[in-house]
């Protein structure tokens, strides 16, 4: 009976597909990438560094606000993690994880919006090898690391980590990665230092997608993942990210005199990112949780409703997951040309930067000055990965097949009309985003026993352009070649001062302001295939102010900070299907103004020789301070559907940014044992709002006050509470003394190694096993139409959620010598 119901529903949907036009249901890739779950599981603290000897430090931080909230998408002071910069010797580099920072013995200074890393001399020489197991992401990993003095004033710090396996909690998640990081330094007579670094991490991992409350409730699984399905009885994911973006760094420092030091640095990042997804050509979306395939879509057709509901509740994977077998069967029925295929959005990156400058002593202070040049080229195209049993597709714009006006402008590239695309070929779009920056900077630092003062300024010039490699028929005169150059003059100013008011009492203030361009993709109306820029591109403005009080004694540290962060005049471009006009559209949102302010407190107390208590809290308000303005263009002709219509977002909270975050922990270390417990709370969290859904043209569709409230109310997410445990034991072995010999012409030296040891670690995240914590969520920008009596009613389509992991485990064993 169950199979008959499935066949009945399938036949109905096939008939329905034959009557419906092409549906624009693609998720915007750039937007969705932000919500990809890439949480880093931090290992428990390993040893006595957790309760090391106290030293006065004006930069004191418990780090708890950075590390203890992996269960949710955290935004410290309202700044999302993906907007935080990582700087190595003042040059921006891709994200570097905490374990790598510790292994390479990098100096680290963190703030709410950036992490500054500095290559330092080795603090200790050590080699280690370890194995780790985690119940989430890629469970199995092995690692090797070493920090050595090599002779002839060379030193090396390096680590190698390999990860693999399938996630034990979420179906369809698996991956492999190999990470290698190394820093070599060379010194000459205490006046010159050369630093060379390499960071490389080739990886392949599947990702999960957010889904609707209806899907989670029907499956009874908050970890439901619609991105995978079965093919020939084996699990296959449609969303796989493949990355290899190695970064090389070279730094040189030369003490020219007692007063002046020369600093040169350069970075090069060159590699490729690929992200796969299913394509459909003149067919319906294969996404299993699409609103047209859910029981709620058939509310007025009882038989179909119950049949679909039964398939979902019964976890019929032909319906609840991607039916790859059916996709292959559909392709076979269509002959050699594919109806469904798996493609990859590819981005090739070449990013280089050079920074040159000098530091000169001026009395009790010094001044640093110099220049920085940055060039970036991002080549973007679509590549066919798997034709799912077929032999080719024709490189056409299939969204236009049923278009009465533009149905004769189908060619994606007029240079190769009707080209047959096979596996491995580029198709669809091919373009490059180019950016060139040049800037001059100066920093003055003044220091006495009580006062520290930093004043930094930077002015620059920025040139952004697009180059199209395809001549799209729809925009034959404005898709190929180099676009208009968009030019900006960004600048930044930062003032920081700290003062020792009395013994153990510090006061610090920071003031920063900067202007910078919006994201390159948000400067073009249709970056994939059109050189047209948005109207009047403008820079965004960021302002930050904070005042901090710090009290420190050998057994206690308390830091209290008042902060204000204003991000103003931002622009965002997204691509959606506009349900009111029935057009695939390009949406430009201007005047996005955000304000974040609040209080941040961190404290640490050491007692009874071996105990440490820590606590940190943020109480803030993160909101949109003005309404923004939305312009909607048809994707086919760039004609205006809506021009600068007001979006009523004023007063809404920033999405996925807890405005209350509290964490408290207790740790113990003695005789090689380390144990810690942390309790974490995050509240006043809200869903990511849709600006498009709050325009007057949408709100005018409400037929009652209740429906208007449903369209405008921002959903508050459930508060999150977790408890984490960690335990480790270090078994110290005999002390080793190694002698290292150089060539006969060089002297011999002896390097005293610390005691070798075995370290066993165990960690538990979310000890209580809470399964209803929303990791992140966002509102849909689509409408759904219902017929009630003789009129149609529009409601916003269901919001999408991603839930946090339940109880997870981490265990490792490491031998260090």
Predicted regions and their residues:
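C-terminal beta-signal and adjacent terminal beta-strands/loops
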Residues: 7, 22, 613, 681-699, ...
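Outer-membrane beta-barrel signature, preferentially recognizing the C-terminal barrel domain
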Residues: 225-247, 251, 433, 483-492, ...
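Transmembrane beta-barrel wall of Gram-negative outer-membrane proteins
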Residues: 135-164, 169-208, 240-258
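A beta-strand signature from Gram-negative outer-membrane beta-barrel systems
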Residues: 92-143
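Gram-negative outer-membrane beta-barrel transporters
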Residues: 562-566, 587-693, 812-816
């Amino acid at each position: 009976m169950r199979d008959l119901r499935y066949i009945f529903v399938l036949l109905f949907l096939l008939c329905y597909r034959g009557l419906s036009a092409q549906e624009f249901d693609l998720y915007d890739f750039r937007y969705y990438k932000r919500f990809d779950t890439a949480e880093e599981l931090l290992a428990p603290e390993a040893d006595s560094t957790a309760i090391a000897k106290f030293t006065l430090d004006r930069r004191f931080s418990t780090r708890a606000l950075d590390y203890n909230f992996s269960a949710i998408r955290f935004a410290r002071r309202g700044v999302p993690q993906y907007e935080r910069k990582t700087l190595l010797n003042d040059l921006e580099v891709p994200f570097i994880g905490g374990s790598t920072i510790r292994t390479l013995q990098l100096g680290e200074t963190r703030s709410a919006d950036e992490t500054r890393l500095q290559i330092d001399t080795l603090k200790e020489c050590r080699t280690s090898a370890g194995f780790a197991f985690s119940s989430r992401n890629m469970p199995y990993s092995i690692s090797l690391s070493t920090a050595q003095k090599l002779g002839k004033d060379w030193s090396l710090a390096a680590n190698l980590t390999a990860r693999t396996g399938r996630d034990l909690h979420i179906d369809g998640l698996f991956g492999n990665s190999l990470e290698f990081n190394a820093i070599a330094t060379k010194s000459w007579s205490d006046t010159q230092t050369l630093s060379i670094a390499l960071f490389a991490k080739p990886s392949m991992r599947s990702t999960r997608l957010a889904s609707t409350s209806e899907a989670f409730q029907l499956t009874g699984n908050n970890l439901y993942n619609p991105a995978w399905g079965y093919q020939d009885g084996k699990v296959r994911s449609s969303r796989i990210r493949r990355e290899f973006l190695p970064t090389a760094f070279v730094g040189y420092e030369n003490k020219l005199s007692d007063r002046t030091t020369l600093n040169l640095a350069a970075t090069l990042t060159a590699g490729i990112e690929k992200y796969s997804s299913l394509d459909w050509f003149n067919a319906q979306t294969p996404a299993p949780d699409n609103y047209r395939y859910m029981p709620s879509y058939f509310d007025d057709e009882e038989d179909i409703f119950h049949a679909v509901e039964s398939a979902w509740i019964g976890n019929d994977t032909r319906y609840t997951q991607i039916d790859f077998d059916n996709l292959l069967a559909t392709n076979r029925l269509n002959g050699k040309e594919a109806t469904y295929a798996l493609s990859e959005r590819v981005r090739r990156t070449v990013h280089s930067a050079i920074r040159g400058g000098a530091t000169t002593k001026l009395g009790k202070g010094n001044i640093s000055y110099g220049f920085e040049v940055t060039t970036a080229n991002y080549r973007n195209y679509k590549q066919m990965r798997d034709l799912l049993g077929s032999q080719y597709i024709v490189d056409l714009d299939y969204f236009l097949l049923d278009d009465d006006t533009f149905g004769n402008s189908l060619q994606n590239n007029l240079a190769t009309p009707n080209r047959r695309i096979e596996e491995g070929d580029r198709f669809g779009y091919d373009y490059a985003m180019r950016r060139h920056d040049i800037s001059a900077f100066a920093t003055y630092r003044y220091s006495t026993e009580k006062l520290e003062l930093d004043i930094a300024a930077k002015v620059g010039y920025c040139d952004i352009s697009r180059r199209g490699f395809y001549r799209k028929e729809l925009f034959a005169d404005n898709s190929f070649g180099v676009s208009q150059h968009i030019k900006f003059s960004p600048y930044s100013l930062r003032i920081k001062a700290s003062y020792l008011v009395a013994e153990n009492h510090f006061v610090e203030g920071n003031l920063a302001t900067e202007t910078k361009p919006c994201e390159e993709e948000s400067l073009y109306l249709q970056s994939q295939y059109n050189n047209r820029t948005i109207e009047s591109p403008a820079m965004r403005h960021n302002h930050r102010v904070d005042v901090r009080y710090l009290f420190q004694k050998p057994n206690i540290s308390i830091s209290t900070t008042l902060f204000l962060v204003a991000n103003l005049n931002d622009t965002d471009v997204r691509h959606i299907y506009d349900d009111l006009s029935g057009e695939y559209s390009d949406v430009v949102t201007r005047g996005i103004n955000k304000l974040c302010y609040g209080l941040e407190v961190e404290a640490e107390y050491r007692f009874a020789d071996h105990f440490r208590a820590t606590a940190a809290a943020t109480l803030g308000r993160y909101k949109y301070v003005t309404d923004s303005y939305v312009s909607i263009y048809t994707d086919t002709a760039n004609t205006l559907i809506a021009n600068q219509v007001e979006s009523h977002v004023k007063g809404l909270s920033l999405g996925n940014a807890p405005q209350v975050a509290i964490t408290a922990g207790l740790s113990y270390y003695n005789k090689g044992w380390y144990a810690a417990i942390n309790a974490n709370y995050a509240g006043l969290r809200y869903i990511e709002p849709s600006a498009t859904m709050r325009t007057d043209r949408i709100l005018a569709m409400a037929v009652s006050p209740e429906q208007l409230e449903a369209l405008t109310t921002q959903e508050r997410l459930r508060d999150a509470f977790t408890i984490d445990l960690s335990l480790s034991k270090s078994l110290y072995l005999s002390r080793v003394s190694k002698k290292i010999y150089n060539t006969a012409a060089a002297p011999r030296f002896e390097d005293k190694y610390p005691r070798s040891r075995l370290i066993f670690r165990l960690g538990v995240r979310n000890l209580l096993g809470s399964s209803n914590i929303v990791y992140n969520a966002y509102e849909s920008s689509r409408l759904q139409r219902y017929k009630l009596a003789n009129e149609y009613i529009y409601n916003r389509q269901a919001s999408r959620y991603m839930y946090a992991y339940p109880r997870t485990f981490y265990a490792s064993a490491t031998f260090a010598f």
